[in-house]
Amino acid sequence: MAKNRALFAEYEPKNCKDVFGVINTRQITALMFHDEMADLFDFLGLRGFKRMHEYQYLAESAEHRTLKRYYLNHHGMLLPDEEIEPVDVIPDDWYQYNRMDVTPAVRKQAVQKAMEQYKEWECGTKELYEKCAAYLMAWQKIADFDKVNELVKDVDMELKYLERLCIELKSVEYSSDYIAGLQDSYHEKYKEKFKDIGVSIC
């Protein structure tokens, strides 16, 4: 993921199609990321965090469809799906184990690593979207800028709550008991948020 951050620093789109193309690729990769994160937390028996990523997967899937339809309706062209690199959130050797094999020590370490990966992912996404928005503004593509700026604000809000969660978990040194105690409230919170999934398509 650090590799992706470095690539974003050098990213220089030539036109609107380049901008929407790289966002399209990032969104597809994000769906893969949240899908694996949901599987990871489900395997760890942390159903609240699992549902959090399931919600992000479904919400961002709708967001992705909206972006593709926006580009087609306003630019009259299809966005090609570029080659996508795997995200590899779940260690390869985990696939040979049963979820009952997970020890408290492994669970604690896995949660800490996953939260760090999640934060790094969203920071990278925000950085990319902000750069794309800046190019569109410089080109005076205001309608396109507004569309991408919606994505910037969405990921910025996601980061706000994620950073609070990371600080909360760090303050208790990723206590297994504390993490377990959060699961019911997170499960119910995102169960309710599932009802609100929907985006405006123009």
Where does each model-flagged region fall?
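Iron-associated oxidoreductase/ferritin-like identity signal
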Residues: M1-C202
